[in-house]
Amino acid sequence: EDCRRQRQMCIRDRCQGYSEPGSGSDLASLKTKAEDKGDHFVVNGQKVWTSYADDCDMIFTLVRTGPQEPKHDGISFLLIDMDQPGVTTKPIKLISGKSPFCETFFDNAVVPKENLVSELNKGWDVAKRLLQHERNMIAGMGLGGAGSAKKKKDQAITSGMATMAKTYAGEEDGKLANSSLRQKIASFDINSHAFSLTMRRASEESKSSNSGPSPASSMFKYYGSESNKLRYELMLEAMGTKALGWEGEGFGPAELAITREWLRTKANSIEGGTSEVQLNIIAKRVLDLPQ
C-alpha cells in the first residue's frame, strides 16, 4: 500500500533534494536531519540547486536519520510535501539570466512515517540508483536530445550545426568556407554518432538483462556533459561577433538563446556529479584500477 501511494506521489510535480551547501560532490556528508517523533519525522536543514523547487509540490529528499552511523549508512530517503509550513524556497539567478534552481529550507517540517522510501538509514542505495538514471539523462545533452530540456525551436539550430555555420562563416563549393571549423564540426558529428550508437547498445543490453543502469552511466554522463559544452563552443565560434549579444538590437532571438545556453552548459560538468567524480567512478568501478 505504501509503495502504491508513494508511486502516486512521484507522479506529481516533484523535485530532488540532494545537494547542500558544503555537500555537493561529497553528497554523503549531508547535514539535513530528520528526527523520529513516533508517527512522523521532523526535518530541519537546507538543500541547494533544487531544480524548479518553486514550481513543485513534492520533493524527494536525502536526510540524515542515523547521526551515529557511518555517513553512507545513516541516510534515509523521504518524500516531503512542499505545500506545508516549514518548507520555503528561494530561486537562484544564474549567469544565463534564468532561475531554474532554488535553495530549499526545512524548518521543523513534518513528514509522515509512511513517506519513508525503502528502509530507515538505507536511502543511499535509492539515491545511487536515481543518480545513475539522472546521469544517463544528462548524457543525452551531448546529443542535443530531450535530456537537455531544450525547446523544439532550439533543437533545429543545435542539430544542424554545419548548416548554421555556413550561414555565418560562408561556404565554398557547397562546403563550409572555414576549413578549421569544418574539420572540428565533422569530428564532432562523427563522435556524436558513435556516442549515440554506444548509448543505444548499452540501453538495449540493460533492457535484455533487466539490470537497469550501471556504473557505465558515469562514462555516458562524463562524455555527454563535455560534448554538450563543445557543441556550444563550436556554435559560438561559427557565429563570431553575433555570439557577443545579450539583449537589444542587432541580434536575433535564436542568437541570444544560443549565447545564454552556452553559459548554461558550464553547469553540465557539475550537475548530477562533477566530471571529476565521474572519472573516479569510472576508474574504480568500470576499469577496476587500484586506489
For each feature predicted by the language model, list its residue ranges.
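Glycine-rich phosphate/pyrophosphate-binding beta-alpha loops
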Residues: 48-53, 95-96, 267-272
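Glycine-rich phosphate/cofactor-binding loops in nucleotide/flavin-utilizing enzymes
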Residues: 126-144, 239-291
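Single conserved hydrophobic/aromatic residue that forms the stacking wall/gate
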Residues: 1-7, 11
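C-terminal helix-coil-helix/basic helical segment that borders enzyme active sites and/or dimer interfaces
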Residues: 173, 179, 193-250
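Glycine-rich beta->alpha junctions and the first turn(s) of the following alpha-helix
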Residues: 87-196, 268
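A structural signal for short hydrophobic beta-strand segments in well-ordered beta-sheet cores
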Residues: 32-35
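A short core secondary-structure module
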Residues: 40, 44-90
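A short, Trp-centered hydrophobic/proline-enriched beta-strand micro-motif
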Residues: 12-18
